[in-house]
Every structure is written in structure tokens, then in C-alpha cells.
Amino acid sequence: PENKGMALWDREELETLMTKSHNNGIQLAVHAIGTQALEQVITCLEAVLPEAGETCLRHRIEHDEMLTRDQIRRISKLEVIASMQPNFTGKWGLPGEMYEQRFGSKRIETINPLRWIADSGITLAFGSDCMPFGPLYGVHWAVNAPFESQRLSAAEALRAYTMGGAFAGNAEQEVGSIERGKLADLILLDENPFLDPTSIKDMKVQLTIFNGQVVYWANKE
């Protein structure tokens, strides 16, 4: 609990790298876990970025675990994307699992403060990192987090996995939603996630369409 982790970059190095990337039109994707790491990243971003709205690079912070309310406010002001992995909650955030073992029962409620972030207006982009890969698992734990105060609705979680990711990749004109003119990338589930959000992780994909072509059909004879 007393260990704050290992910083791979000091502030001056990080700020120099961020400035060089930003000035050359390169999108930043900064890995930061822990309040101290996030504080350093946010402070550097505040020094580097112009006023919000002047850039289309859509810089983002990866993971964002253990954000404080003040840090969330500052990220919102910078219009930086929060790239997060709600599947971590299902893997490590349940009672007795790694988060509680390392940080104690009082701290674990806000390790992944999805509700606070969504309410602040920050764009959420969800992904899997290295485990487990299935997005339905991540959607499930964003909606059914152990602490009600940090739960999202099914619509919010699905949007973060679809339009949120597309926006983070500057690809929302091509993918992320089912609209005329966009690529036909979609799935059909065996149940409606809006009717019973408590069973999302157990729902099965019946049909997968990629770029307009059926690539998986569970019941095809």
C-alpha cells in the first residue's frame, strides 16, 4: 500500500516529449496508473496543450485508474480522452480480489471512477488491454460494477466501446455507429442488453458483419 510505483519518465523529459509530439501533429496516448502518475501526466498536459478546442489530435490518457475528482475536472478542461478498461473491474475489482488486497476496502470504490468521469463530460473510450478481450465482459462490469456509485448505464458503456473508440481514433466518420455511409461493422446478440443488463457478460454473439460481409453466423446450417 505504501508503494507508489515506478515513474518511467521524469516531468521534464515527459513534457519535452509531449511538446515535440504535439507540435508535430502526433496524438498522445500516455499510460498512467495511480494518483501520482496521473498528476504528473495532467500537469505536463496543462503545460503543453493550447486552450481546449484548438487541436484535433484528441490526446488521451490510458487506464486512468485512481483519478481524483480534481484531476477529472482538469482532464475535462483539457478535453483529453479517458481510454479505460472496465474489464479490469471484473478481473480485479470484486470483493477480496487484487484491488482490495493492495489498497483496502475504502479505496477500491473509486479506483475506476467511471461515473464521475462520464458525468464530467470527458469522452470515454473503452478497450480490453490484455485481458479479457471480449467487449461484452467489459460492458457488463461497467454497468454492474461492485459499487453502484460508479456504474454506467448500458447505453453509456456500449457507446464508450463503439463511438468512444472511433472518436479516439479519429474514425467516427467511418465506424462506431450504424449509419448510412459508414462501414457495416456490427453484431447481433441473442438477448437485448438494455432489457437485462445484469446478464450482459453471458450474452452470445449470433451474427458478425464486418465491412458489410457476414463473417460469423452461429446458427447457419
Predicted regions and their residues:
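Active-site-adjacent helix-turn-beta-strand microarchitecture at beta-sheet edges
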Residues: 1-22, 72
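His/Asp/Glu-enriched, well-ordered alpha-helical/loop segment
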Residues: 18-29, 36-59, 84-198, 203-211
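Extended hydrophobic secondary-structure segments that form protein cores and membrane-embedded regions
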Residues: 59-65
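Acidic, glycine-rich active-site loops and adjacent beta-strand->loop/helix elements
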Residues: 65-67, 88
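Short amphipathic alpha-helices and their capping/turn segments at secondary-structure boundaries
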Residues: 67-81
